Amino acid sequence: MSAKMLHVVMYPWFAYGHMIPFLHLSNKLAETGHKVTYILPPKALTRLQNLNLNPTQITFRTITVPRVDGLPAGAENVTDIPDITLHTHLATALDRTRPEFETIVELIKPDVIMYDVAYWVPEVAVKYGAKSVAYSVVSAASVSLSKTVVDRMTPLEKPMTEEERKKKFAQYPHLIQLYGPFGEGITMYDRLTGMLSKCDAIACRTCREIEGKYCQYLSTQYEKKVTLTGPVLPEPEVGATLEAPWSEWLSRFKLGSVLFCAFGSQFYLDKDQFQEIILGLEMTNLPFLMAVQPPKGCATIEEAYPEGFAERVKDRGVVTSQWVQQLVILAHPAVGCFVNHCAFGTMWEALLSEKQLVMIPQLGDQILNTKMLADELKVGVEVERGIGGWVSKENLCKAIKSVMDEDSEIGKDVKQSHEKWRATLSSKDLMSTYIDSFIKDLQALVE
């Protein structure tokens, strides 16, 4: 008997860092003949439709983002909301899409619904005869930590006090954010545990080679199947070329000499920290290209420059707020070092690149991803922070020099370790095996 062709609904959190990985997985499902209905806000459709590689198998359905007090007018995505404290209102808006979401599900009758932040999806799935799969596109380590802290800090029969909730753990991110509101009448912690405890199965965008022990821990704690998709990165575009201005600029410098620094499209540095970081790049005396949003309170990058900076680096340094072709830049032979925030998607791109890695994590799972790369896999270095998490120009320069100087033992060691892991992870058979196994798990779930 042939395996069932599935109809899968995708409903990710309204952030491109979630929506894009969901779409990459949709493309993999569609390649093998499965049907996908991908539900998203209208403005996101404009950005994502070109990433749909199988339009005959993947259908986009837009959903209206309700107006919520405190949410900026027209906001449909975290990118529309620079102030991270207002993201709770977007979560409220997501929850208020439930009636329209239910109408869509009732109409199309899917076999499986994959979701993340919309913790109530399992209730909808049960109502209409579908299976629910919580898909985590952040590191399994960070999800495991939230479970560990709550279950192990205090006796199970004793409620946590506010002081216990605020307690910090050495070398781990401050977890008080888990207990703050994330939506109307719900905390981030309750949303996260609800997402994972109510579903029929958990899927993680990772692989056993990197996070096997964390995935096994999640399976044990939630007493359910945890299936892995692998990192699900897009295939490199055949013949993809770098836009002319960047290609021409990079080609001016010798092989492996350029620093490429990127912090993602959803994070905004404080002005003084932005200035310190670009001064640190300048201090290395190496050419550099930095892609970053304008700092908080600034309309443009240029208005935040320290005095004299633009003139001093005009021949070897560029800072831009434009979207850049990150993967294509990472493949350019002039680039030798990737300075990044270690968001989960960026982490995989960094691991699969041939560049030296320097990490400056900013928040959430980025801190744990960095610990994994720097301390466990030993494929890069983390920039040392000062009081209050401050990244000084001296410490940034020191970290970069430690991996870029030809005679540096640290640089040699992380390069050797990185090459080993890149060889393992770049195996096409390895990644296709994960997708094949994931699809079989979905088919078994609906039988």
Curated annotation (Swiss-Prot):
Domain of life per record: Eukaryota
Keywords for the protein's UniProt record, in alphabetical order: Transferase
Biotechnology and industry use: Soapwort saponins possess anticancer properties and are also being explored as enhancers for endosomal escape in targeted tumor therapies. They may also serve as precursors for vaccine adjuvants.
Expressed in which tissues: Mainly expressed in flowers, flower buds and young leaves, and, to a lesser extent, in old leaves, stems and roots.
The EC number(s) this enzyme carries: 2.4.1.-
Xref: Pfam families: UDPGT
Source lineage: Eukaryota, Viridiplantae, Streptophyta, Embryophyta, Tracheophyta
Name used for this protein in its record: UDP-glucosyl transferase 79T1
